[in-house]
């Protein structure tokens, strides 16, 4: 396909900024769609694009971060939440949790014009923190929302947050009491969360063992 210099420049800038590419004019958007239809690009989210070859070399987490960075640039007021926030904080988790969905905090329900891959997590009062230039729910609030995952999948996220000293058990407990969340799941996760867990694989295994009611491995 004939090179479109503006689009090539957009793709190069996006690569440098480790995010997906997007057009800012109708001409750029049309040119990007032509490359998409030609098979040169992929579109993981509406109006966002990435080089197909480069995209296929990335892990699911890296792909999610590329989308999040682009959406943060387009919608700087968005507060990313749940698994999306966990990714930006660098919390360890199983990549199988990624299904292309982007999670944001919202004081309102689902918008009629929302992209199918956008999930709004209702939060009446949204506690925020900026991390790497991206607006996120605080680590404590992020853990509350990640309690929605199955226990073995959520435990690595909790362990990682405590290991990184992003929050404390007491802070999460305090916020839990003030928030609408799954208190049973959060309480169980806080009971078994351990900052001494060295990596996500170890945390996942410990979570699976706990679920099967075997003895809890002693971490040193």
Residue map of PLM features:
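Active-site metal-binding core of divalent-cation-utilizing nuclease and nuclease-like domains
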Residues: 214-220
């Amino acid at each position: 396909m004939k090179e479109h210099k503006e689009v090539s420049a957009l793709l190069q800038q996006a690569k440098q900024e480790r995010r997906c590419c997007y057009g800012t004019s109708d001409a750029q958007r049309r040119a990007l769609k032509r490359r998409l239809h030609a098979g040169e690009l992929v579109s993981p989210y509406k109006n966002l694009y990435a080089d197909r070859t480069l995209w296929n070399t990335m892990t699911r987490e890296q792909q999610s971060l590329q989308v999040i960075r682009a959406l943060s640039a387009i919608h700087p007021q968005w507060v990313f939440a749940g698994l999306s926030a966990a990714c930006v904080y660098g919390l360890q988790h199983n990549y199988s949790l990624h299904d292309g969905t982007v999670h944001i905090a919202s004081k309102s329900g689902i918008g009629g014009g929302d992209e199918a891959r956008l999930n709004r997590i209702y939060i009446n009062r949204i506690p925020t923190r900026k991390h790497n230039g991206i607006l996120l729910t605080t680590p404590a609030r992020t853990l509350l929302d990640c309690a929605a995952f199955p226990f073995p999948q959520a435990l690595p996220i909790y362990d990682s947050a405590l290991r990184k000293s992003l929050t404390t058990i007491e802070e999460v407990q305090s916020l839990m009491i003030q928030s609408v969340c799954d208190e049973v799941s959060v309480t169980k996760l806080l009971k078994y969360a351990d900052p001494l867990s060295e990596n996500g694989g170890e945390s996942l295994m410990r979570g699976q063992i706990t679920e099967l009611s075997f003895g809890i491995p002693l971490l040193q």
